[in-house]
Amino acid sequence: MAFPINLTQTLLFFFCPLLHLSFAAFTPTDNYLINSGSNTNTSFFTTRSFLSDSSEPGSSFLSTDRSISISDTNPSPDSPVLYNTARVFPVGGSYKFQVTTKGTHFIRLHFAPFKASRFNLRSAKFRVLINGFSVINSFSTSSVVVKEFILKIDDPVLEISFLPFKASGFGFVNAVEVFSAPKDYIMDQGTKLVIPNSAQIFSNLSSQVLETVHRINVGGSKLTPFNDTLWRTWVVDDNYLLLRAAARRAWTTHSPNYQNGGATREIAPDNVYMTAQEMDRDNQELQARFNISWGFQVDEKRVLHLVRLHFCDIVSSSLNQLYFNVFINEYLAFKDVDLSTLTFHVLASPLYIDFVAESDRSGMLRISVGPSDLSNPARVNALLNGVEIMRILSPVSSEVVSGKRNVVWIVVGSVLGGFVFLSLFFLSVLCLCRRKNNKTRSSESTGWTPLRRFRGSSNSRTTERTVSSSGYHTLRISFAELQSGTNNFDRSLVIGVGGFGMVFRGSLKDNTKVAVKRGSPGSRQGLPEFLSEITILSKIRHRHLVSLVGYCEEQSEMILVYEYMDKGPLKSHLYGSTNPPLSWKQRLEVCIGAARGLHYLHTGSSQGIIHRDIKSTNILLDNNYVAKVADFGLSRSGPCIDETHVSTGVKGSFGYLDPEYFRRQQLTDKSDVYSFGVVLFEVLCARPAVDPLLVREQVNLAEWAIEWQRKGMLDQIVDPNIADEIKPCSLKKFAETAEKCCADYGVDRPTIGDVLWNLEHVLQLQESGPLNIPEEDYGDVTDPRTARQGLSNGSNIERDYGDGTSGIISSTQVFSQLMTNAGR
């Protein structure tokens, strides 16, 4: 029986890992451990001995005589001895190992940069190949990194090569591990390929090259190579939980009941299966049925990953009490999981389930567990014990790593082919209906048409008919012109990379500078985003919304062309780049501009548009630092007049996501307000919305900033670059506005119009102080929209902004377009 962790159990919980160290460790058939650049052997974490590669027998593995061994002359006292030396490859080099047992092997490469007399390892830039297959491209690091790869070796020799990226570069490594994996560590049977609306079988998994990205001990403490059977490291899940209130830790002191055919101690150590996160059913703020969700940044967009989930029912007092569902990226991956049946009716018996899933357009993988329809209402629960995420690298034709992914693509192609056929059929019907109703529709309201969402794939004909039938002919730009204007999409002109594809700096025939966003060639996965941006941006113009110049759909391409924003994203002027930091006044003006653009989206039609992905990288700056909201791929129409929300799947970016929208899947314009509030704190503190490398209390920017705000000490975490120039009255009002935006419930958040008015007041306070307003009163400002009774509610006004921007707005929104000249 497992118990939720409370204060009296905390010590026992954290010492739990120490109770299970006596089991016999796995003994691999092939086992090579190299201490690179050292003259002596050394141990690391355990009794495993790493051989020096500067003397026999370790030096026999080096296949080059042009490498250099270096030592850290000033090592940190906390640094392991293994990381005090390194092998440097100025012109490339490799290690070669004899493989006695063919099959799956682990390869771990340790990189711990330091500065020596001749080399600063932090400036290294190189590639790593395994038997000629590139596993690391253009690698450099300023901190300790351990890269782990799992792959099948069929040759008698394993060669690991380190190649400088350019002539001026060099490669290095501090330690190398090569050892054979336990039998059946990667299985070819039973792996589910999670795709929209179904879960197919992914074949030939053992022949793929895997790179470990995350290894999580859910609900437990950190595990090191000292207490793991395969010398792995498992980190805690606290920083990955999307809603901490939904989960509570559970644990047991009883050893897992391992069964034949289930998990083994080599798959995961005891401590993983003895702890878990389960639903916090005592939390009264949550609904009766909810999911526990984790979000994992994997960096690579639209890339397949092996997701291995570990389960052990340590929360049930008897069999057949626990039923739950598993979701990956919102798709149902496993319905009605019954651990009792899967473990042959043995309680607390470990097992794991493998899935293959694709990361989303933001480079995220989201995993959720939640109650099943089979759950007893009195025992609704779900749990998860561990997570491993491994990136599946590009298909390999090398003899060393055999196997192909043809089966996968056959499955995917079959499914998507069905979607293509259905899409063509429904589009044909749609076109006929449009011809019939064209006159009627042209006389209707000028509000935006609802955005269409497509699933699966489509070919160029489908796209052409969809876009062409929308009447956007004047926006078409030929592929030849874009190819010429970007020097054949030269990689040196890339100014950004997103989930849709790369963004290039380019120019048109008339020498107009543009930003060219090109969807991944041959892929139709971005079709909904492609259509959404054209639908929205072709119908509106506003000074603070990025303008669409045109699009291209020739040769199965999906290319969007925008006005060029010289200064790039707001984020690059706050942190993480060499750009000079913006002043406090500039930051306020940027926030005000973005709020104006967002307010126009929310109020520019009867339904309005909800952006759904407001963040600092989607607010761009032109040459004069004028802010413009960009990237409308996730946007959709707001609720109808008689509705309060739009029910839809959760979309957005980790760290900016409205918690209420996440819990209820009910989208409103207040979801954008929450995201904008996070941006306000980002502007003030100059740090990311989520930073998993920080201590737990600081990981989430909004939570951390609000905590300091409520203590009256927000000035202590303000960006040092602007701390001396912010007036206290300006900071106070700005912080109050940001805090209200980030309220847990949408009803407690202001409208974006209120936010806009308050930000303009913040700027006035910064430039002139509170003037005649008593200090205790300047925290609340009345929005002038409350004094609109003199305007007719039924009329529409077409506004000309003098700078070429225009749009249809109702008279009830006219005040949102007024410019406040004071303080400009």
UniProtKB/Swiss-Prot annotation:
Compositionally biased residues, Polar residues: 456-467
Subcellular localization: Membrane
Name of the protein described by the UniProt record: Probable receptor-like protein kinase At5g24010
Protein residues bound to ATP: I495, G496, V497, G498, G499, F500, G501, M502, V503, K517
InterPro entries xref list: Kinase-like_dom_sf (IPR011009), Malectin-like_Carb-bd_dom (IPR024788), Prot_kinase_dom (IPR000719), Protein_kinase_ATP_BS (IPR017441), Ser-Thr/Tyr_kinase_cat_dom (IPR001245), Ser/Thr_kinase_AS (IPR008271)
Keywords: ATP-binding, Glycoprotein, Kinase, Membrane, Nucleotide-binding, Serine/threonine-protein kinase, Signal, Transferase, Transmembrane, Transmembrane helix
Transmembrane segments: 407-427
Protein family: Belongs to the protein kinase superfamily. Ser/Thr protein kinase family.
Principal EC category: transferase
CC annotations in GO: plasma membrane; plasmodesma
PROSITE patterns noted in UniProt: PROTEIN_KINASE_ATP (PS00107), PROTEIN_KINASE_DOM (PS50011), PROTEIN_KINASE_ST (PS00108)
Species whose genome carries this gene: Arabidopsis thaliana (Mouse-ear cress)
E.C. code: 2.7.11.-
